[in-house]
Amino acid sequence: MVLDLDLFRVDKGGDPALIRETQEKRFKDPGLVDQLVKADSEWRRCRFRADNLNKLKNLCSKTIGEKMKKKEAVGDDESVPENVLNFDDLTADALAALKVSQIKKVRLLIDEAIQKCDGERVKLEAERFENLREIGNLLHPSVPISNDEDADNKVERIWGDCTVRKKYSHVDLVVMVDGFEGEKGAVVAGSRGYFLKGPLVFLEQALIQYALRTLGSRGYTPIYTPFFMRKEVMQEVAQLSQFDEELYKVIGKGSEKSDDNSYDEKYLIATSEQPIAALHRDEWLRPEDLPIKYAGLSTCFRQEVGSHGRDTRGIFRVHQFEKIEQFVYSSPHDNKSWEMFDEMIATAEEFYQSLGIPYHIVNIVSGSLNHAASKKLDLEAWFPGSGAFRELVSCSNCTDYQARRLRIRYGQTKKMMDKVEFVHMLNATMCATTRTICAILENYQAEKGIAVPEKLREFMPPGLQELIPFVKPAPIDQEPSKKQKKQHEGSKKKAKEVPLENQLQSMEVTEA
């Protein structure tokens, strides 16, 4: 996931000032651009010097061959003249004036210079890449410039009544329909662990089937992805911070051979976007085959580091969940990827409109975008029980930022002489099932249960096609009685703790 290096090179038509400005708008370090330009300039000088040294080495070999052919004297172990040791000014005439033994010494010295130059070049290349991968994509002009997501995300449009309030939040409703086991889930799997059960399993499967059918009717190919990826591939699709804050690492045997003691490092996927992005790694995609549209289905795993204390109850923010994802490879020409961007968010909107879930679309501020996204729109559903908007969908155009690192190229240049182009890559959530279930529960709660959205009824089993009944009391309604019981038990305990002499004094007063 990187920008084109030529964008940093003025002599190649690049504009480092523009990238510096982009970094400032993202509220990231613009100094990375200057560090990269410096490392790249030194790298290019080093490569130029290495190329010249290799030419000199070839010239030495050619000159030796010519002298041997003429049967010139090889010469004794004579020293090399000082003027010849300046390789920047070394000419064919200067070499021709030397003995064969001297030229061989020069060639050895050139070899040493090449090795030194190659070492410097590798070091500079690593330094350049470290800066390059931490510099974000160029921003679309419509992105709001701010570092305050809560205050400055721009609301683009609203659908449905986002003022309605209802009694219960999803935290209570998952318990009331007996579709969730959180305490035992936490014992088995740790923090945010859960068992989804009963009617909510059927509701989740209904959402998956409906989402896949919807995308299938729009030309998307359903694809069920691997749940883990090799480290070297994950490094090409995830930014550095994700390895610490989001991804789970898995260690396993390097192969199926019983005598193989090597170990392989892999990472659980946070979204099917990651393996689908790598699906066409190292390929040339033909213009006539684009756009390529995938409906990714997978379980997703996220550490959620940094969300401590947020949404700790219920199933809205969990470490493991199912998700259907839109993913598209697009042409980089004629604004095609931005047309596809509009189409993808529209598809998500139609899906939630068909489910009758009110929402608004927000344009995410520059400071909250990940490195790859040039622009991101979120669909935030209205949760009438919580009295808040909550994110259900994120739609991003990453332009060629991901494709460049994955080497997914556009077309094929004539005789491979033209500048290589890369496809544009886009992703958008269609349905993260646990979050969508929460939205349905809050919006469709009624006196006796949860009304099933009409579009999902054909996917539900008999007895649950119209209503998911409440079978347990709401935890929030039980909290006052629990609190009173606790206070009563506390009073009894305090009474027992009263010293004996105080009790006797009390009895004497009563008798008097």
Curated annotation (Swiss-Prot):
The Gene Ontology CC terms held by the record are: cytosol; mitochondrion; nucleus
Q: Which GO terms describe its molecular function?
A: ATP binding; enzyme binding; molecular adaptor activity; protein homodimerization activity; RNA polymerase II cis-regulatory region sequence-specific DNA binding; selenocysteine-tRNA ligase activity; serine-tRNA ligase activity
Q: What are the entry keywords?
A: Acetylation, Aminoacyl-tRNA synthetase, ATP-binding, Cytoplasm, DNA-binding, Ligase, Nucleotide-binding, Nucleus, Phosphoprotein, Protein biosynthesis
Q: What subcellular compartments does it reside in? A: Cytoplasm; Nucleus
Q: Which SUPFAM superfamilies match?
A: Class II aaRS and biotin synthetases (SSF55681), tRNA-binding arm (SSF46589)
Q: CDD domains, from UniProt?
A: SerRS_core (cd00770)
Q: In which pathway does it act?
A: Aminoacyl-tRNA biosynthesis; selenocysteinyl-tRNA(Sec) biosynthesis; L-seryl-tRNA(Sec) from L-serine and tRNA(Sec): step 1/1
The site annotation (Important for serine binding) covers 429
Note the Pfam families from the entry. Answer: Seryl_tRNA_N, tRNA-synt_2b
Region (Interaction with tRNA) residue spans: 9-61
Q: Which residues bind L-serine?
A: 271, 302, 325, 427
Which residues are recorded with the post-translational modification Phosphoserine? 241, 506
> What are the Polar residues biased-composition ranges?
502-512
Q: Name one GO biological process term.
A: negative regulation of angiogenesis
**The keyword Protease is assigned to this record:** no
Q: Which residues carry this modification: N6-acetyllysine?
A: 323
Q: What is its EC number?
A: 6.1.1.11
**Subunit structure of this entry?**
Homodimer. The tRNA molecule may bind across the dimer. Interacts with SIRT2. Interacts with METTL6; interaction is required for the tRNA N(3)-methylcytidine methyltransferase activity of METTL6.
State the domain notes. Consists of two distinct domains, a catalytic core and a N-terminal extension that is involved in tRNA binding.
The entry's family comment says: Belongs to the class-II aminoacyl-tRNA synthetase family. Type-1 seryl-tRNA synthetase subfamily.
Question: What is the name of the protein in this document?
Answer: Serine--tRNA ligase, cytoplasmic
Task: Kindly list the organism's lineage.
Answer: Eukaryota, Metazoa, Chordata, Craniata, Vertebrata
